[in-house]
């Protein structure tokens, strides 16, 4: 196929596989790739190889140093665990320690709906933050975000909302 000028002019010979197409975005420095649309029916078949259109959304701008501002995220699901593009493995329902860069990244699309965000008390300014080792996954104990001496007590609130959700 690569020697056929008609297939080259029709963008067939140089086409990516679906996997290769998404990988090309990653190699170009994009993150958070999502396949938004994939044609069920191929628009052409050549020598038993089907060609179809896919639409991919990707994001730029996650470069930078990793600083520990004592933030944590909780992956909400639906999967038992996920592995992000940087190799962070996150288990559903657990309080994960993340660097400020990852924390800010998860607060944006396409990640935001899948996480709960825990800011520290008190806030750690960027200029006071220490380097964070993103290569080792770890959980963040509530005492790290609230402080070792945190002993606040509050009045009990109604545990069910107006719609009887408990």
For each feature predicted by the language model, list its residue ranges.
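C-terminal lobe and adjacent flexible extensions of AdoMet/dcAdoMet transferase-like proteins
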Residues: 26-166
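Segments that shape or occlude catalytic/ligand-binding pockets
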Residues: 17
